[in-house]
Amino acid sequence: VASKRQRDDFSESELTVHPQQDHAAGPTAVAVSMKRALERMGPARTARTLAKLNQAEGFDCMSCAWPDPDPGHRHAAEFCENGAKAVAEEATTDRATPEFFAEHSIADLDSHSEYWLGQQGRITHPMIKRSGATHYVPIDWDDAFRLIAAELTGLGSQDEATFYTSGRASNEAAFVYQLFVRAFGTNNLPDCSNMCHESTSIALQESIGIGKASVTLDDVHAAKLIVIAGQNPGTNHPRMLSALEVAKQNGAKIISINPLREAGLVRFKNPQKPKGVIGHGTALSDLHLPIRLNGDLALFQALGSLLVEWDALDHGFISDYTTGFEEWKQHVKGLNWDEVGQSTGLTRDQIVEAARMLQASDRTVFCWAMGLTQHRNGVATIKEVVNLALAQGNIGKPGAGLLPVRGHSNVQGDRTMGIWERPAASFLDALQKEFGFDPPRENGHDVVDSIRAMRDGRVSIFVGLGGNFVQATPDTDVTMKALRGTRLTVQISTKLNRSHLVCGDTALILPTKGRTEKDIQASGAQYISVEDSVCSVHASRGPLEPASPHLRSEVSILTSIAEATLGERHGINWRSMRDDY
């Protein structure tokens, strides 16, 4: 393994503006992917990792939650430029060793950009910043666990600690984490989904009874119409472009709804096909609606109004499976079209064209992401998407349904495993039945509540399972001040980030294994699992030796913290969970 190389920091002065692109991917994406992979990993590690990325016997990509094709239908290179870069960042040969931390004070590190911090490589040892210290220094694993346990058990109330989860944590780690936190005695389990698809989860739960997608990848391929609102797959979910290409080849139409005309929704040059290398690729969007910011609610109601006017409805489905249709019908019939135009920035002709495409389709898939969720009325907007699907019976049948496209690779799985500050009573009852303790029943802190509680001195311990809390959360200045006011911060991480530097009076960095690495426990080789955007759960096994012999897996770290904190309380066998998961 190469020693850590000092890298130049990122400079915004080097940014340039180029003409807008008219396509995504192509040979350039391959060249950039390979360049980054070879620079960060070298030829041998590049070959070993990328050949296993998103393969049935390999490891799951950490860059997004787009689903994998069924085994037997996957390409040899089943990854995108983003995925190759994410793997290169984790499987880098650079290392952030104790010598690195001795050389750089926390203030020095904090003066660098987030990009530079990540370029310093994998953290090799557990590290601690003691009260009043200027540098991180190594700490023994057992000493770290004892310190955490002493701080947690010394709290006046269990609710004075909060336990954050990033969507890259595995199902196994997430389950152990929430079990420990609830056995400890709190539901303070904020996670990254609080800041992205929380409005989706609420809207879908309140309308169709489950806060997840209702489609599979095959449904996307079989759709006659795909509506993509507030989402840019070319940048955020590039492998989705392959699915859209298949749908187009099968005759699908695509409507894109976004203020910007994103290159990835104009044309896709698939680098694994000749026409994507030397040809023009595949045209994607048939209609682009350049909507005003947050005009989506008005647009979806206007589309519903036209479908009602034309009686382009599935009355049998409405009668058998829905409630509240008449109220919705009367509401959309009474829309003021001048207000619709002001809200959407679209002409009536543009909206009519989109509605005619909906009218002509009996198999429609609706996709969306942050462009819909990140508004005060996000829940209401997403419910209008659901209303369109229900009005035409486009749910619960092949080639049709709802597809909230998730970002973090296991953000959906973490919620399934119980990472939620507002758990259902049925879930808590199941925990009680299985493990013999009565979990706390009061709702805990979400992300914003956690920030406020730290700011106000009501939370003094922060534990982060992955992620970069400081950079991911709203109101950065307030978040920084809140974290710096805590007594202890604990970060379970693979690489250096800002949240290690904006920390509590005492701070711990607990380095963990990544997706690309082998995981050997007492019972032998382990694998983890993740859940993608279409609710498919699959295994992940890394091919590489760990970046350092001092690393521990997420599950190992969490069960060790639980053992040190709870001992034999509740009779939960943490060791058995650690030895074989």
Where are these regions (language model features)?
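Low-complexity, highly charged intrinsically disordered N-terminal segments
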Residues: 86-135, 145
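Intrinsically disordered, low-structural-confidence terminal and linker regions
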Residues: 1-59, 64
